[in-house]
Amino acid sequence: MLVILGGLPGTGKTTIAREFARALEAIHIRIDTIEQAIRNSSLAPAEVNEAGYLVAFALAEDNLRLGRTVIADSVNPIELTRAAWREVANRAGTSFTEVELICSDIEEHRRRVETRAADIDGFKLPTWEEVVARDYEPWTEDHVVVDTAALTPDQALANLCAIFSSPHEGEGGTRAEGIGGEGRL
């Protein structure tokens, strides 16, 4: 199974993805780590976004074909990349679930962005102004929405684990709908 995780910087993606990967004994593939490794290489292209996603797609597909669950951790700002992740799952013959993390409390979101520290050597975190100005297309496919403003990381993790342990999860590439019938946690 592929968990396609996305959301703006500062919504808690990596914090939740790491713990979710531990809980599911899954592979955690983080775009920021891949892109920074490319930047650090002697062959670093000026624009690493495409290369980072292509590497992540390949790593995810390899692991999915081994029967592993993969958590894909990226901003995933446009439908093009979301569709590409879905295609990775389809090629590997496995199910996928799309999960968007949001932080509906603007002040809390800003506080997180402005106070967090990078955990990847050389990685430059975006400023609040860069987060707000970022192109981010609305999600159009069925997906789970996790509002991290209203949940602690442990609560978000517990809710995700409950969804992924439900009997309907992962049937034929369907997406989970979340709690409350609206796909929102």
What are these regions (language model features)?
Residues 51-96:
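Glycine-rich phosphate-binding loop used to anchor ATP phosphates in small-molecule kinases
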Residues 8:
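P-loop (Walker A) phosphate-binding loop of NTP-binding proteins
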Residues 11, 15-66:
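Conserved substrate/cofactor phosphate-moiety recognition/catalytic segment
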Residues 5:
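Hydrophobic anchor at the beta1->P-loop junction of P-loop NTPases
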Residues 92-112, 146:
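Conserved phosphate-donor/acceptor-positioning beta-strand/loop module used by diverse small-molecule
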Residues 115-157:
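Small-molecule kinase domains that catalyze NTP-dependent phosphoryl transfer to phosphate-bearing small molecules
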Residues 170-171, 177-178:
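Glycine-biased, low-complexity coil/linker segments
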Residues 2:
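Walker A (P-loop) ATP-phosphate-binding motif of ABC ATPase nucleotide-binding domains
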